[in-house]
Amino acid sequence: MDKVKIALQYLMPKHLVSRIVGKFAAAEAGFVTTAFIKWFIKQYGINMSEALHSNPEAYKTFNDFFTRELKPGLRPIDQAEDIMVHPVDGAVSQLGPIEDGRIFQAKGHHYSALALLGGQADDAARFEEGDFATIYLAPKDYHRIHMPIKGTLSKMTYVPGELFSVNPLTARNVPGLFARNERVVAIFETDKGPLAMVLVGATIVASIETVWAGTVTPPTGKKVFTWDYPTEGPEALTLEKGAEMGRFKLGSTVVMLFAKDAIDDFADGVKPEAVTRMGQPFAKLED
């Protein structure tokens, strides 16, 4: 059965399906939207008591519901200076060292940091001998993405690609998954060197957004696009630890890359399959 599911993903017109779903998710369809939201809540066991607006009827579109805001104070940010926090609610897929420029995906599967970053060799070189962490956001999760540490935006890259599912089954069976799917790479300058936040698209992910550029995809293209940003002066964008940096409209995965010697060790309990909650300790930074 697993092989059938993977084969269907190769055959499915993934971009077309995702865009059709995206149009529905953005539509103000009244009672149809509300009925679908109620079904989705029940189907995935979503805890609406955490949402700022717990009544499904408060959301005009499915996208509004999916990117729902949490109640204030529900995800307190660990403010210790030597602590990096979880950027999202989700589950750790994999984490560890970047070895020979390669990142571990699942048993028998690796991919290169160079490919993940859209072939940007200068960017990939900055993460040699560093560390990575991959976090999967399930449909039930809160889908806003936050900063693990304070950083100043220096570059954004849009990388075209496939739209395979990014669930654990697919990660185990599709080689180079996260370097094959459409994605948005944001690079920040931090006190511990560069930080890459890679927002990976997936089947029926209607869009990827950032707080500085709005919707980055769609529309999609066939070329890699890059944007450079000033890191000093009045136009520089610095985001504090815990600040929102982006969001998915339907679930996906975040891959983070850290510079060599940025991380001393991952926090207790942070390992593959561990549940993550935004704002809680993720790693201890090097002194």
From Swiss-Prot:
It is found in: Cell membrane. The record marks 251-252 as: Cleavage (non-hydrolytic). Binds 1 pyruvoyl group covalently per subunit. Its cofactor is pyruvate. One of its GO terms (molecular function) is phosphatidylserine decarboxylase activity. Pathway: Phospholipid metabolism; phosphatidylethanolamine biosynthesis; phosphatidylethanolamine from CDP-diacylglycerol: step 2/2. It catalyses: a 1,2-diacyl-sn-glycero-3-phospho-L-serine + H(+) = a 1,2-diacyl-sn-glycero-3-phosphoethanolamine + CO2. The active site is at 89 (charge relay system), 146 (charge relay system), 252 (charge relay system), 252 (schiff-base intermediate with substrate). GO terms for cellular component: plasma membrane. Is synthesized initially as an inactive proenzyme. Formation of the active enzyme involves a self-maturation process in which the active site pyruvoyl group is generated from an internal serine residue via an autocatalytic post-translational modification. Two non-identical subunits are generated from the proenzyme in this reaction, and the pyruvate is formed at the N-terminus of the alpha chain, which is derived from the carboxyl end of the proenzyme. GO terms for biological process: phosphatidylethanolamine biosynthetic process. The modification Pyruvic acid (Ser) is found at residue 252. It comes from the Bacteria. Its EC number is 4.1.1.65. It is an enzyme of class 4 (lyase). The keyword Lyase applies. It holds the Pfam family PS_Dcarbxylase. Keywords: Cell membrane, Decarboxylase, Lipid biosynthesis, Lipid metabolism, Lyase, Membrane, Phospholipid biosynthesis, Phospholipid metabolism, Pyruvate, Zymogen. NCBIfam families: PS_decarb. Belongs to the phosphatidylserine decarboxylase family. PSD-B subfamily. Prokaryotic type I sub-subfamily. Catalyzes the formation of phosphatidylethanolamine (PtdEtn) from phosphatidylserine (PtdSer). Heterodimer of a large membrane-associated beta subunit and a small pyruvoyl-containing alpha subunit. This is Phosphatidylserine decarboxylase proenzyme. It comes from Shewanella amazonensis (strain ATCC BAA-1098 / SB2B).
